[in-house]
């Protein structure tokens, strides 16, 4: 968990939550905004929102953007206790979105 947490903190330390959230809402196809917003949702403790946001990106995006959303989601999964039921639901949803 240590490395994944450190990476998350580094990614979010200079983000302004209100600006990122507004950008993600106004530009749903902006993959960077969606990834940043998901990071902030994790930091604030809203795992469900972060997971759902990125799973929706995997469903909607194609190519490199889809891969970026999937990889980012998998990195966020590393922050969560494997026994957490939200993780199981998110993994199942991701599998469904991928296939």
Regions from the language model: what does each represent?
Residues 26-27, 61, 80, 98:
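Alpha-helical junction/boundary sensor with strong preference for TPR arrays
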Residues 12-13, 44, 80:
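Structural motif corresponding to the intra-repeat A-B loop/turn of tetratricopeptide repeats
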Residues 2-5, 37, 57, 73, ...:
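Structural register within alpha-helical repeat arrays
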Residues 1-35, 39:
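Alpha-helical adaptor scaffolds
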């Amino acid at each position: 968990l240590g490395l994944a947490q450190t990476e998350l903190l580094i990614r979010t330390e200079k983000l302004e939550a209100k600006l990122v959230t507004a950008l993600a809402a106004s530009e749903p196809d902006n993959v960077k905004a969606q990834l940043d917003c998901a990071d902030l949702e994790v930091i604030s403790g809203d795992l469900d929102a972060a997971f759902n946001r990125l799973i929706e990106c995997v469903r909607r995006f194609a190519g490199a953007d889809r891969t970026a959303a999937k990889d980012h989601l998998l990195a966020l999964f590393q922050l969560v206790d494997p026994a957490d039921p939200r993780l199981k639901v998110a993994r199942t949803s991701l599998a469904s979105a991928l296939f």
